[in-house]
């Protein structure tokens, strides 16, 4: 739940090796630190855009507050995506891009997940209905599960695809079977039986 009247004693620090390349920080970052305290890991400005890393257990509450608070009003979910780095020591990131049309602000939120742990974050479909296909694409390409999503299934690949998740760094660069075999599997998947004609067109 969103705490009432809590304040952070120390502002989140800029992470090492991330340049602060000018631009004023989005005031929402300071507001988040004041409201959510140590559940905000850190924040920084890069190329004029404010980035905020949030603990995974708080991300739904943070996004809900940004959407509903009259001083924030982030009405538009621009994108949900993920990033996996070549450095095995770096966590996999789930990224939400939010925009406030009322206050002309942009905010990038991130959650860090260990590639060796469960890749799961809460769905925000109950806040933004437009998150539906964005979350499904993250599941399809990265294997990130969005807890609470009512229909989490593949959206770009066929449902019976078993080769893994194509945007992960451990995805094989060479297929284990021919393009003809892939086509055969795709045709056998019978997408019309699982998807509406509206989705297919």
Segments (PLM) and residue ranges:
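Terminal low-complexity/charged segments
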Residues: 1-201
